[in-house]
From Swiss-Prot:
Organism: Porphyromonas gingivalis (strain ATCC 33277 / DSM 20709 / CIP 103683 / JCM 12257 / NCTC 11834 / 2561)
InterPro entries assigned: Cytidylyl_trans, KdsB, Nucleotide-diphossugar_trans
SUPFAM superfamilies reported in the protein's UniProt record: Nucleotide-diphospho-sugar transferases (SSF53448)
Primary location group: cytoplasm
GO MF: 3-deoxy-manno-octulosonate cytidylyltransferase activity
Name of the protein this chain belongs to: 3-deoxy-manno-octulosonate cytidylyltransferase
Length: 254
């Protein structure tokens, strides 16, 4: 394990689409426990950052490391920064891993960390290619932000809308005619950059799309995007949870 890496898992109880999501039961374990167990098997430290006593107690009950953060944090990255300032031990890379990704793969975490083999990398994230047979309905889902990349693998823009627009092509054919990238919302930062980007005021594009990474782009920070071959099952709604539990059962992970 790379001892210069710490993973922080922001977890909020309040959610407009799925209140109490971190503590939702997944066949005998809470979602936050399943997330923590996956990550703790890959990196030397995995710390849950929360502002809710119920989550703190649940994490302590299963033996995980947890830190309380301010309820005033406006984003997961702000919560990640506050947690690192409180419990960091001089690690060189800070991972911000979502508390609603219980199926995150070891290969994805390793890939994210590998971005920092290049000294010019300050921020890294992952993307997955939409399959060529993906429907326009799936592509157009605003809960699956899309990314446009430059030739060097850095993000030009993130959007909940479909970008780019294929002029003169029927929407159901877009994924066959163009390579679209789905953002997987996990990040890695150098600590100095994490502190800088969380000190910036919100940007106009960030406010419009409700995507905090647009703030970093608007202020001139570069985000390196690595392509993963593994799919994940993010959980945004109770319906997503039903699918996740069905997947657990199908894999004999009860």
């Amino acid at each position: 394990m790379n001892t210069e890496v710490i993973a922080i898992i922001p977890a909020r109880f309040a959610s407009s689409r799925f209140p109490g999501k971190p503590l939702a039961d997944m066949l005998g374990k809470s979602m936050i426990q399943r997330v923590h167990e996956r990550i703790a098997g890959v990196v030397p430290r995995a710390v849950v950052a929360t502002d809710d006593e119920r989550i703190r107690q649940a994490v302590e009950d299963f033996g995980g490391e947890v830190v309380m953060t301010s309820p005033e944090c406006s984003s997961g990255t702000e919560r990640c920064r506050e947690a690192f300032d409180k419990v960091g031990r001089g690690e060189k890379i800070v991972l911000n891993l979502q508390g609603d990704e219980p199926f995150i793969q070891k290969e994805q975490i390793d890939l994210l960390i590998s971005a920092f083999d290049k000294p010019e990398t300050d921020i890294a994230t992952l993307a997955e290619v939409f399959s060529s047979d993906a429907s326009f309905e799936r592509l157009n889902n605003p809960n699956s932000p899309k990314i446009v990349l430059d030739h060097g693998g850095y993000a030009l823009y993130f959007s909940r809308s479909v970008i780019p627009y294929l002029r003169g092509v029927q929407p159901d054919s877009w994924c066959r005619r163009h390579t679209y990238y789905k953002h997987i919302g996990i990040y890695a930062f150098r600590p100095t950059v994490l502190r800088k980007i969380t000190s910036l005021p919100q940007s106009t594009a960030e406010q419009a799309e409700s995507l905090e990474q647009l703030r970093w782009l608007e202020y001139g920070y570069r985000i390196r995007v690595l392509q993963t071959q593994q799919s994940t099952i993010g959980i945004d709604t109770p319906e997503d949870m039903d699918k996740a539990i069905a997947y657990l059962r199908s894999q004999g992970m009860e």
